[in-house]
Amino acid sequence: MSSLGPLVAADETFNHQIIDTFATVSQADRSWTEKVCAMAAPRDGSVQLAFGMGKYTNRNVLDAYAGISRGREQWTVRASRRLLPDVDHLAAGPITYEVLEPLRTVRFSLAPNDVVPISFEWIFTAALPPALEQREQHRSRDGGRVDADIVRYHQIGTATGWYEVDGVRGTVDEAAVSTRDHSWGVRYMVGPPAVDVEDPARPAGVSTIVLWSPILCERQDGSRYGLHVFYQRHRFGDWQRVELQGGVEHPDGRREPFLQLLPHAEVRDDNRRLVRATLDCTMSDGSTRPLELAAVSETGFHLGAGLYFGLDGHWHGEWRGDLHVDGEYVADCTDPATARRLHQMRDNLVCVEDAVGQGVGFGNMQSIFAGAQPEIGLTEEASFL
């Protein structure tokens, strides 16, 4: 006798792709995740709103984070709840995700709460069509297990809305940039690390650069286009592996891919914050397209507060009961010890000058600079994820 998952509202749609209900995914891996992540910020970098939500069908968990970064300060609310039977309700505690128009308009909101004195609501409006990224698939070091098998699309747009900190309300107008991504599949670092398998710790001597960045650019005539970079470089002695995707994105859906990218970055060694960089890009026709970018301010939400790479012994998708809500205020995220707790990857608002495209852009640069990289002054001793 076969068993089926419970019926949910989505089962009324004509979108089934496996022989089961929408309460079930096609495999039993506990790391299966569907996730959204978004940011919004005015171009002056005075403040940034952050949002993330994950659905872990095989863990019966839906969790989320919402936060505000303002200069060196950061406020975060995290929530986790039992997924079943309310699998279609995309909310956990005070945090809510709502699709207003598919692939076009989304609302991200944080209601007033008892954790930290912040709340917000912003509506993402697409400036460009969503862009499906290449399938991201990584194996364990021994090659025996697929650690990550993810499909992701990102979208570049603008934001309108409001935010409140300590009872003082500010507005987000349509000049603010907003980026979002939506992914699903088997992810790394879901749930506490397994204790009965080989230690996956990073080998000494390995250096890594990861850059992921969607940018909204505008020319003097008001026309818009996007830039997207997803660059990963792993180096060990004379061995090196580079993965690259991205390019120029046009409003009509056309995409001009990057063939090669060479980053030249200035990064603080003590907290691994990206200050500025030149990305020497080569297009598929062989032409060069250098991109000059710089962090707009100290503002930038540390994603570790949303449980990326874990936080204080807790992880994405971890069972916390029927409903659990927590969070914290951090006074200075640039402090090296604090940066290690929150990890270095963050939603860093950057300004980009694209001389070839004749545009200036603003967007989100997530970066990791791990290991010793003496060519840019980074030491092994100061390295952390």
Residue ranges with predicted function:
Residues 1-385:
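Structured soluble/peripheral alpha/beta segments that form catalytic or ligand/cofactor-binding pockets
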